[in-house]
């Protein structure tokens, strides 16, 4: 058996020592007395091979049987004691798969996504033969998409997605001067018109900045 990398303090009570005159064995420094001790290789091998499992205090060994035991323990260990390398790998693969699903969902969405659940405004655009997106000149419309939750691809509930009916700005803010309008004689009509015009101006500015 070749040299060991061991924690002598953990096993010194279980392993017999040879005489210091012997040339065989691996030299280990005793930190308390600062004298050289010679560990019996046969006794040490018997100690390791007789253990049901190899713990961190046993350190590592070049012995094939001990290596096999370490590998076996790393695979079948539980969460309360040792960490399984296989478990870590499976967890990382699961996280990467979820990240891929999120990116795919975001890339496939053409209306914009609000992960916190918000309103995203977008202009109406048409696709030409040159595969370029150009703004429609005939009508500028506003669509509000309210997104709540996340995609079912992530294993959760489906997003609630309500699409507001598209209306032209001119139709949305046209004056209610018709004969059948109940607001015509309202005492608050003047304040309402000022507020409505201000809202229209803000909305147009928002659209132009997009």
Swiss-Prot record:
Q: Which GO terms describe its molecular function?
A: ATP hydrolysis activity; magnesium ion binding; nucleotide binding; RNA binding
What top-level branch of life does the organism fall under? Viruses
Instruction: Provide the alphabetized UniProt keywords.
Output: Glycoprotein, Host cytoplasm, Magnesium, Metal-binding, Nucleotide-binding, RNA-binding
Q: Where is the composition biased (Basic and acidic residues)?
A: 129-138
- Post-translational events: O-glycosylated.
An example of a Gene Ontology BP annotation on this entry? Answer: viral genome replication
The cofactors named for this UniProt entry are: Mg(2+)
Region Disordered: start-end pairs: 119-141
Query: Where found, per UniProt?
Result: Host cytoplasm
An example Gene Ontology CC term for this record:
host cell cytoplasm
Residues that, per the record, bind Mg(2+): 86
Instruction: From the UniProt annotation, give the residues forming the signal peptide.
Output: none
- What InterPro entries does this protein's entry cite? Rotavirus_A/C_NSP5
Main subcellular localisation: host cell
Which Pfam families does this one have? Answer: Rota_NS26
Q: What does this protein do?
A: Plays an essential role in the viral genome replication. Participates, together with NSP2, in the formation of viral factories (viroplasms) which are large inclusions in the host cytoplasm where replication intermediates are assembled and viral RNA replication takes place. Orchestrates the recruitment of viroplasmic proteins such as capsid proteins to these factories.
Subunit-level organization: Homodimer. Interacts with VP1. Interacts with VP2. Interacts with NSP2 and NSP6.
Protein family according to the UniProt entry: Belongs to the rotavirus NSP5 family.
Descriptive protein name: Non-structural protein 5
Question: What is the organism of origin for this protein?
Answer: Rotavirus C (strain RVC/Pig/United States/Cowden/1980) (RV-C)
Q: What is the lineage of its organism?
A: Viruses, Riboviria, Orthornavirae, Duplornaviricota, Resentoviricetes
